Design a protein with these regions (language model features):
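A glycine/threonine-rich phosphate-anchoring loop and its flanking beta-alpha core
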Residues: 12-103
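Short glycine/serine/threonine-rich phosphate/pyrophosphate-binding segments
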Residues: 1-6, 46-49
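DPxDG-like acidic metal-binding loop motif
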Residues: 3-15
């Protein structure tokens, strides 16, 4: 959900990128995104504190990465207790994702 909200927030201030696929890669946007308060419920990509986010293109059955320095949330709420209720497999998968990003 954080990734989707980052795309929406950037498009709201940069309507020329209304087709989210145009944001793939290093985004050439000119204006800062709408302010985002990100509440992370898993570990993983760190979209709540970085310029990166991943979007699913259901038409083409693929995912793509966007990177935009104008699209960093203004506040990130990270509560480790949120991960306590995750199923063990999801906890392991998102934890490994966070580890790989850190490396």
């Amino acid at each position: 959900a954080i990734d989707s909200s980052k795309a929406i927030a950037i498009i709201m201030k940069n309507p020329e990128f209304a087709d989210v696929r145009s944001l793939e890669g290093a985004s050439p946007t000119k204006h800062k995104a709408m302010p985002i308060i990100a509440v992370s419920t898993t570990s993983g990509t760190a979209a709540e504190v970085t310029i990166n986010y991943v979007i699913t293109d259901e038409e083409k059955n693929r995912k793509f990465v966007c990177a935009d320095p104008h699209d960093i949330p203004v506040v990130a709420i990270i509560d480790p207790d949120m991960t306590a209720s995750m199923p063990p497999k999801l906890c392991a998968a998102t934890g490994m994702d966070a580890l790989v990003h850190a490396i």
